[in-house]
Structure formats: structure tokens, C-alpha cells
Amino acid sequence: MVLSPADKTNVKSTWDKLGGHAGEYGGEALERTFASFPTTKTYFPHFDLSPGSAQVKAHGKKVADALTLAVGHLDDLPGALSALSDLHAHKLRVDPVNFKLLSHCLLVTLACHHPAEFTPAVHASLDKFFSAVSTVLTSKYR
């Protein structure tokens, strides 16, 4: 999915507004994913998956850091996320549908924390961005 110049602007400006909260939101979105889609827990048998878990928060920060990297490389997502794509496809073998589930929970989390900024245009741009990231992360499954 190709991000338009307006999409790129929306994604960058939204991500800039998250400030130091990106890791917190990543953890919250991951908690939301586990609560809403319990089958996603199967990839984390060694984690304490209870609400507020330090392990979930730490992994949520990793998710947010990867997305921050992607935001900084909107014109080369495959290059920026190549190592993560390899990891998820070949070592972790995460079912690709889980990226869509997490993307949805990220959108919900961002909308909850930034309702005024979460306009239809921003929502659409973030959805396209998360979809593009998901596509890159699943590209090496083929």
C-alpha cells in the first residue's frame, strides 16, 4: 500500500505528538490485543500476561520502537524492517493475521488517548501505515 504525501504527513505528525508515550501506548495496545484476541497469547507462553505486566509493557515498547523506526523510513519500509520481517517469518513464525489484530488495537489505543487529533483523515492514514508495516513484516513468509 502506497502512502500519499498527506498520509506521510499525518503519520509523522501523529507520531510526533505521542512524544514519550509511544512505549506506553504500545504496551496498552498489546494488552488490548491479548484481551480481545486470546489466541494471540500463544506466542508468549513465557510471559506474565496479566494486566500491567512488566513483560507486556517491555514488549509493547519494542513494538513502538519498531513503529518509530518505520515512521522515520516511510519511503523504505522494507529496508527499515527487513530484520524484523526475517525474525517474525523464520524464527517466531507469527501468523500474519496477528499483525492486523495488533494494528486494530493500536488504532483504538491512539484514538482513546488522542480523540481530538484522531480525525477520519488521520485514522485512514494510520490504518494505511499499519497495513503497510504488516505487509512488510509478512513479506518474507512467501
UniProtKB/Swiss-Prot annotation:
Phosphothreonine PTM positions: 9, 109, 135, 138
Database matches in InterPro entries: Globin, Globin-like_sf, Globin/Proto, Hemoglobin_a-typ, Hemoglobin_oxygen_transport, Hemoglobin_pi
Keywords per UniProt: Acetylation, Heme, Iron, Metal-binding, Oxygen transport, Phosphoprotein, Transport
UniProt: O2 binding residues: 59
CDD domains listed in its UniProt record: Hb-alpha-like
Domain Globin: 2-142
Phosphotyrosine PTM sites in chain numbering: 25
Cellular component per GO, a single term: hemoglobin complex
Molecular functions per Gene Ontology: haptoglobin binding; heme binding; iron ion binding; organic acid binding; oxygen binding; oxygen carrier activity; peroxidase activity
GO BP, sorted A to Z: hydrogen peroxide catabolic process
Positions bound to heme b: 88
Keyword Aminoacyl-tRNA synthetase set for record: no
Pfam families found in the cross-reference section: Globin (PF00042)
Keyword Iron found: yes
Function (record text): Involved in oxygen transport from the lung to the various peripheral tissues.
Quaternary structure note: Heterotetramer of two alpha chains and two beta chains.
PANTHER family reported in the protein's UniProt record: HEMOGLOBIN FAMILY MEMBER, HEMOGLOBIN SUBUNIT ALPHA
Record family assignment: Belongs to the globin family.
The protein, known as: Hemoglobin subunit alpha
Taxonomic lineage of the native organism: Eukaryota, Metazoa, Chordata, Craniata, Vertebrata
